[in-house]
Amino acid sequence: MIESITGYLFGIVPFGDIVFGFSEFSIIGFITAVIFTIIVYLTKPEKQLEAQKFKIEDKLEVVTLNELKIRRMMAIVCGIATAGAMLTYDLFDYALFLTLVGIANIGIVSAVKREWVLNASYQYGLIAMIATLPLFGSAGMILAKTGTLSIFELPKIQTSLLFEKIIFAAGMAGETGIAPFYAAKAEMFRAPGSPYILMIHLSSLLLIVRTVEILLTI
């Protein structure tokens, strides 16, 4: 099953309990995250022209230098965490990367001086913190049932992990802010400052695909 999903495995790089695997699937996700991180580092933020209510003239929204530095740094952290999540083949380490991406997503919009953006990020932050319970809880239950968290070893163990997979998927949904939790995150995307905001989309998309690959593998 693992070969049919991930493609050919070129090799692994172990760092103690942390194991990075280089397969066709993981390399594509890793390169995508790295390329977009470089684009974020080199690109200046967009300038938005907002229509004003009961006014003829439009308002030009410009990202200040201090705001730019914070958001660029958090977008780069988000990209690095996403790239790491693409390569790791340890379930606990993947959960750590997933949590770090959720924190970075909040950090990307934390410097925006708009009440509705900060309210949305606060609500998303609450959901992300709650989602860590099923995320790490499912990893703990898998470890207790199988004795390992290695994505290479779990497919070899003949044990039903359906309940643990469902809980892990629920934790991932909360961390990435997809349905049914998208409502708390939607307003964050209206904040000015692309491509930093697009990093939230990209990281969520890559992590969803990676989680599906992991759940089908184990």
Swiss-Prot record:
A GO cellular component term found in this entry reads: plasma membrane
- The highest taxon in the source lineage is Archaea
- InterPro entries from the xrefs? NiFe-hyd_3_EhaH_prd (IPR017059)
Q: Which UniProt keywords are present, listed alphabetically?
A: Cell membrane, Membrane, Transmembrane, Transmembrane helix
Q: How does it sit in the membrane?
A: Multi-pass membrane protein
Name the residues that span the membrane: 19-39, 92-112, 124-144, 161-181, 196-216
Record's subcellular location: Cell membrane
This one is known as: Uncharacterized protein MJ0522
- Source organism per entry reads Methanocaldococcus jannaschii (strain ATCC 43067 / DSM 2661 / JAL-1 / JCM 10045 / NBRC 100440)
